[in-house]
A protein has these predicted regions:
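Surface loop/turn motifs at the tips and blade-to-blade linkers of beta-strand repeat domains
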Residues: 24-26, 74-78, 126-129, 177-180, ...
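Per-blade loop-tip surfaces of WD-repeat and WD-like beta-propellers in eukaryotic adaptors/scaffolds
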Residues: 8-21, 40-42, 51-73, 91-94, ...
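Conserved beta-strand element within WD40/beta-propeller blades
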Residues: 1, 45-49, 97-101, 151-155, ...
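Helix-rich alpha-solenoid scaffolding regions
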Residues: 26-30, 44
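Canonical WD40 repeat/beta-propeller blade segments in eukaryotic WD-repeat proteins
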Residues: 29-38, 78-90, 130-143, 182-193, ...
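C-terminal, well-structured subdomains that either form a transmembrane helix-short loop-helix hairpin
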Residues: 233-260
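A beta-strand-loop signature enriched in Asp, Gly, Thr, and Trp
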Residues: 172-176, 183-192, 200-202
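Conserved blade-ending motifs and adjacent loop-strand segments that build the rim/top face
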Residues: 176-187, 221-242, 273-276
């Protein structure tokens, strides 16, 4: 997105793996972040505006242009200010999003039904870390009956895991990420727990990509660092593959790196791509 204009691209198998613009749309007031809905909801993109507006978009016809598929939702943060990040929950938890605000407030929004054109509402809010901006979000990638929804929240002063307590009807802190000092967490991601006894998350902070294990009861999580990778420049993004076995990181030096655990449980770089 640039200047409120959002472009949608699709990989073209006939052009040696190149990408071609498929369509786009213009968001009045600009775009702070965007996110794809789960496939079960169809082809839907959510945009978070700096003015506090959450909008939902989809293809409108054969001409490739997109249009709004639901009335915009005003997601005014707890103390006002702009939105920074939006992420959809896994499909097992229904059609829901979490939106992070400049004031550190997280708003959880839900649709009445599993269609993006349904009516959306703000279901709940919580303050992630007082005195800091919330800049990145990652949902626990699975859920359902007996598994409480969880969110990993990165802020300008650190990161923590939050859990929805169905008994209390609100979000509560479930565990904090151990950092040596207050630091801005640029990005976070929660790995799918495929064949693992514990869950794994990753965060980007300063020149480092950190991998942490999450274990314990939902109400008292134990979060421990198990690997750290120093980069020659600030790390901007971290993302797991679909099986949660390989981590990708991008940094300010224009290089994307892949990290993987070997048979001895040791993590290391296995490949890198230099941007052009």
């Amino acid at each position: 997105a640039r200047g409120g204009e959002v472009g949608v691209f699709r990989r073209d198998a006939g052009r040696a793996g190149g990408w071609a613009r498929e369509g786009g749309f213009l968001v009045q007031g600009g775009v702070a972040d965007c996110a794809w809905a789960p496939r079960e909801a169809g082809t839907v993109l959510a945009t978070a505006g700096p003015g506090g507006e959450l909008s939902f978009w989809g293809p409108s016809g054969a001409d490739g242009e997109w249009a709004s598929v639901a009335p915009p939702l005003e997601v005014a943060p707890c103390g006002g200010g702009s939105l920074r990040c939006v992420r959809f929950a896994p499909a097992s938890q229904g059609l829901a999003t979490a939106v992070a605000g400049e004031d550190g407030c997280i708003a959880v929004c839900r649709a009445d039904g599993f269609r993006a054109d349904a009516t959306w509402r703000v279901e709940g809010r919580f303050q992630a870390m007082p005195g800091s901006a919330a800049v990145s979000l990652a949902w626990r990638p699975y859920g359902g009956e007996g598994v409480p929804p969880m969110l990993l929240v990165g802020t300008t002063k650190g990161a923590a895991v939050w859990m929805f307590d169905a008994v209390l009807g609100k979000w509560t802190a479930a565990g904090s990420v151990p950092l040596t000092a207050e630091a801005c967490v640029e990005d976070v991601d929660w790995a799918p727990a495929v064949g693992r006894a514990c869950e794994t998350v990753a965060i980007a902070v300063s020149n480092w990509a950190l991998i942490l294990r999450v274990a314990g009861d939902p109400g008292a999580l134990n979060i421990e660092k198990c690997a750290e990778f120093e980069h020659p420049a600030a790390v901007h993004q971290v993302e797991w593959n679909l099986s949660g076995t390989t981590l990708a990181s991008t940094a300010g030096d224009g290089v994307a790196r892949l990290w993987k655990e070997n048979a001895l449980g040791e993590w290391g770089e296995v490949a890198h791509v230099i941007g052009q």
